[in-house]
Curated annotation (Swiss-Prot):
Enzyme superclass (EC): transferase
Reaction(s) catalysed by this chain's protein: 1-(5-phospho-beta-D-ribosyl)-ATP + diphosphate = 5-phospho-alpha-D-ribose 1-diphosphate + ATP
Record remark on domains: Lacks the C-terminal regulatory region which is replaced by HisZ.
Main location: cytoplasm
Pfam family, one: HisG
Presence of keyword Glycosyltransferase: yes
Subunit structure of this chain's protein: Heteromultimer composed of HisG and HisZ subunits.
Family note: Belongs to the ATP phosphoribosyltransferase family. Short subfamily.
Biological source species: Deinococcus radiodurans (strain ATCC 13939 / DSM 20539 / JCM 16871 / CCUG 27074 / LMG 4051 / NBRC 15346 / NCIMB 9279 / VKM B-1422 / R1)
Name of the protein in question: ATP phosphoribosyltransferase
Keywords (A to Z) from UniProt: Amino-acid biosynthesis, ATP-binding, Cytoplasm, Glycosyltransferase, Histidine biosynthesis, Nucleotide-binding, Transferase
GO biological process: L-histidine biosynthetic process
Disulfide bridges in this chain: none
Amino acid sequence: MTAQTTPERRPDHLTLALPKGRIMDDAIALLSQAGLPLTRPEASRALRHEFPGVTVLELRNQDVPVYVDLGVADAGIVGKDVLLEAGRPVYEPVDLHFAECRLSLIREIGASGPIARVGTKYPRAARAYLQERGIPAEVVKLSGNIELAALTGLADAVIDLVQTGSTLRANHLEEVDVLFHSSARLIVNRTALKLRRERLRPLIARLRELTAPAGEES
């Protein structure tokens, strides 16, 4: 028995991949400002939401670049941290300037010994950072509560996202270095950019206008 294929979509229909949670709410608000007929979906178990000319797929953060890269979604919104970790060759035309944070190397306050093991949800970024600095540390991939790895001795340091730093201060931890700053980005499938250019290029242009820093509007 062969698997069913998704019916071919019209060139004027967009499929968008958005991450669940706060980013999705902010993304829908911004996309609505940009002219798409979107509203926040009502609470339900539905994972696909239909609007006039637009389908929204509600995904886990890490899956957004996959759906866009493989062409199931024409475009999506995802954090730069997730995008770099995924390593998918998607087009990234707009920094949307929300969901801002930073990926940092974190240790217990006052820790000064060598770093032999690092815990993180971002092994790709961690290995690149450690290799660049010549630190021969083992990288342990973790899924949540990353700070505990430093507090319990599982790791000598952790690499994790930081927004306000309040969680670090509450747990006697500090940032030692910043790997990079992250924010939400619009990503686009490269083939879709050609096939649906009449929908995607005006959307990209409008989002650039809406998110341009003061004094840089086109």
